[in-house]
């Protein structure tokens, strides 16, 4: 009904309706301009393939999926049983932190590629590793000296 009332004339006028310039207080600044497009060697040289590593490609993707799927029963079991066990808290904490680390590592790889940021890329990887270790230590302290991960989530959920 709406289409028949508006008709095709409204589609032609749609450019005028949506031609509003967005409000912006800053100009576009290219912080990291793109590198020059160059070819190493000649055009007739054979392509150099990178070294094959099991930490990249399909093995890495499969490991990420296994970690993500392993979290499902670890979250559901304490919810259905209503109780939490320290071993379940430890397993959930390890898989949750590993899942987060792998996700943030993908972000670091995407936004700070090693071929472009030769010094910043390793620094960002080490910052991520340090934050992951600090998170592991913090969750270990929370699980051993406090109420535990699943009880903490339950209290947050009910508050």
UniProtKB/Swiss-Prot annotation:
It comes from the Eukaryota. One of its GO terms (biological process) is mitochondrial electron transport, succinate to ubiquinone. It is found in: Mitochondrion inner membrane. Residues 31-65, 110-122 are mitochondrial matrix. One of its GO terms (molecular function) is protein-membrane adaptor activity. A ubiquinone binds at residue 111. Heme binds at residue 99. Its main location: mitochondrion. Residues 83-89, 141-159 are mitochondrial intermembrane. It is a multi-pass membrane protein. Induction: Expression is down-regulated under conditions of iron depletion. The keyword DNA damage does not apply. Membrane-anchoring subunit of succinate dehydrogenase (SDH) that is involved in complex II of the mitochondrial electron transport chain and is responsible for transferring electrons from succinate to ubiquinone (coenzyme Q). Belongs to the CybS family. Forms part of complex II containing four subunits: a flavoprotein (FP), an iron-sulfur protein (IP) and a cytochrome b composed of a large and a small subunit. This is Succinate dehydrogenase [ubiquinone] cytochrome b small subunit, mitochondrial. It comes from Schizosaccharomyces pombe (strain 972 / ATCC 24843) (Fission yeast). The lineage of its organism: Eukaryota, Fungi, Dikarya, Ascomycota, Taphrinomycotina.
